[in-house]
Amino acid sequence: MPARPARSAPVALLHTSPAHIPVFDALRDADHPGLELRHLVDEELLARARREGPDAVAGELRAMLAGAVAEGAGVVLCTCSTIGAVAERTDVGVPVLRVDRPMAAAAVAAGPRVVVLATVASTLEPTVALVEEEARRAGRPVEVRAALVERAWALFEAGDTDGCAKLVAEAADAVTDADAIVLAQASMTSAGRFTTTSVPVLSSPRPGLAAAARAAHAAAPAG
């Protein structure tokens, strides 16, 4: 008899753009068939966090996550790097993960010179802090530099995802003195299709979803 698929708890994904839904659904189908994803989208969370700072959305975030848990989610994955730290420290009784933590750990493992690229300025500081946190956790030295890819976010918001990705790829290809390039936002992932640099270009959706899947299997009810 074929092996039964491993049981897992539903995963609620908190997005600040609906564009992330097909990305994570495709990764689920390719890497984690049978994993139940429940998508929550609130674009205003990012807009407010950009205006007032990530902590300004803590109350709304807690309410959304508590609602997802009340409806049966066993794990929450926040796919927005700007508010990821706020989400991660929200106690709703189930694991709350930020999508970019596994990517940050991989960047630290690649070497001490890490370049963070972002298309939204509010993402730079949280991502740099995360890489530095992972370096302390690993006991490794790290030098993190950060750069904003100008005009790319406007293209993304206008629906020109390829145009955004190509600008990000150009910025990545201009980096030569690094051991890893971190694409700070999940929305930047497709830039990997256009890069030619020999420096590893890391994105968050695949390793982030893998971490959520592991947590979902661990949280599944027995039987």
Regions found by a protein language model. Give the residues of each.
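Non-catalytic structural scaffold of enzyme domains
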Residues: 1-223
